[in-house]
UniProtKB/Swiss-Prot annotation:
Part of the 30S ribosomal subunit. Interacts with proteins S7 and S18. Binds to IF-3. GO terms for molecular function: rRNA binding; structural constituent of ribosome. The gene is rpsK. Located on the platform of the 30S subunit, it bridges several disparate RNA helices of the 16S rRNA. Forms part of the Shine-Dalgarno cleft in the 70S ribosome. This is Small ribosomal subunit protein uS11. The keyword Transport does not apply. PANTHER family: 40S RIBOSOMAL PROTEIN S14/30S RIBOSOMAL PROTEIN S11 (PTHR11759).
Amino acid sequence: MAKSPANNAAQRVRKKVRKNISDGIAHVHASFNNTIITITDRQGNALSWASSGGQGFKGSRKSTPFAAQVASEVAGRAAIEQGIKNLDVEIKGPGPGRESSVRALGALGIRITSIADVTPVPHNGCRPQKRRRI
């Protein structure tokens, strides 16, 4: 016998517990293909996250500043629901969504206390990949 649809509808949905954390860190990973924003508390526990691809942008539109802005608005609203009021922003990567994601977080009413560039730069470490020839 087939299962009744009432069983599927009766599944429990867990609601996120409001944590009331006022200070946090926004980690912005801006690559050439996508932008990922993760908002954590001071200890590094993730409160919310969003990406350009997760907001419905596909292909080359993921790497636009507008897509990064939309993703940071989504992550910022979820963080505000958790009680975030102040953010330190850490930006990693050379992508086009670096500046627009920080502006979007500030426009939501979150106070940005510091902006740091934490892009990893090698001290002549590993050999890079071969040059692309088109």
